[in-house]
Amino acid sequence: MRPIKLMGHERSLTQVKYNREGDLLFSVAKDNAASIWYSSNGERLGTLEGHQGVIWSIDVDPDTHLCATGGGDLAIKLWKVETGKCVFTWESPSPVRRVAFSPDGSRLLAIADQVMGHIGTIVVYEINHDDESLTNQSTEPSLVIETPQDGAKATVAGWSANGEFIISGHDDGYIYKYDAQTGEAVNSLEAHGIHTEEKNVTVTDIQFAAEDRSYFITSSKDKCSTLIDVDTFEILKVYKADAPMNTAAITPLKDFVILGGGQEARNVTTTAESQGKFEARFYHKVFEDEIGRVKGHFGPLNTVAVHPDGTGYSSGGEDGFIRVHTFDKSYFDFYVDAAEKNTEKSAEKA
């Protein structure tokens, strides 16, 4: 599984994202320009320039018509993918940590960070897709979800199926489910900080199952990742790692999940990958066992995205590189005998 190595950013990657078809890969980093790449060969299609600082998040709508970015320069920008032109900018009261289009592309959520005296909010904007009036977007959000005064700030968020709920992860390890129409909190769950003794339990990523968005995976600095059902809001599986996790994704076709993270570079005495645990980790989604690791980055993995058709994945690291992997035959041939596994589990319990 020899990857394509993309060198298009001057600083650490913050997010990589495929479009729905998987032919394009979008990336943002702690520099001030987003990049768009052909995922098949790594050729750069273009850059989106306009932010004045770090870009924390990027997302693309289902039709690959519009793209949104959120940054530390207190701006949410809307771009036309075909031309690379910024068509609209929303001002934010604080740095924007995450942007995400609803599944139908009609709405855009953004997390305004809880800093600079701002209490921290999740805002939702209605998106006008009319080509003739893309620059005419509503400046006021259609929904504002405020973090409770005594609550922890939201760090990541995403949409459930049909845009019915907004799921957010917070820096106290809790996950919240909000009604996407009213903003009312429907449910909450302590997903992190209960599986290990780690003090830092910040939720670092949320990604949904591609097929129906009925469940999602989280990652956290507590060295764990959890699989959670949207409907019941119960933890289905827990994947334990040996380093803080920054990102997690669910693979289609095969029952695997991919985790990425590693010790912060300043805490590592050598640059060896094994020393800092800078590998992408593959776990069996059902049995929770680690089944393999992929090396390559010389620093923590900050972001992982799986190709929509399940044929590969991309990772972005603290080292400033993107690695685009295509799975080989051994990946698809790998399988675990469920009956044998259940026998092992029974023996362990006995």
UniProtKB/Swiss-Prot annotation:
Keywords: Cytoplasm, Initiation factor, Protein biosynthesis, Repeat, WD repeat. GO terms for biological process: formation of cytoplasmic translation initiation complex. It is found in: Cytoplasm. One of its GO terms (cellular component) is eukaryotic translation initiation factor 3 complex, eIF3e. InterPro entries: eIF3i, WD40/YVTN_repeat-like_dom_sf, WD40_repeat_dom_sf, WD40_rpt. Pfam families: EIF3I. SMART domains: WD40. Transmembrane segments: none annotated. GO terms for molecular function: RNA binding; translation initiation factor activity. WD repeats lie at residues 8-49, 51-89, 91-135, 149-188, 198-240, 296-335. SUPFAM superfamilies: WD40 repeat-like (SSF50978). PANTHER family: EUKARYOTIC TRANSLATION INITIATION FACTOR 3 SUBUNIT I (PTHR19877:SF1). Belongs to the eIF-3 subunit I family. Component of the eukaryotic translation initiation factor 3 (eIF-3) complex, which is involved in protein synthesis of a specialized repertoire of mRNAs and, together with other initiation factors, stimulates binding of mRNA and methionyl-tRNAi to the 40S ribosome. The eIF-3 complex specifically targets and initiates translation of a subset of mRNAs involved in cell proliferation. Component of the eukaryotic translation initiation factor 3 (eIF-3) complex. This is Eukaryotic translation initiation factor 3 subunit I. It comes from Scheffersomyces stipitis (strain ATCC 58785 / CBS 6054 / NBRC 10063 / NRRL Y-11545) (Yeast).
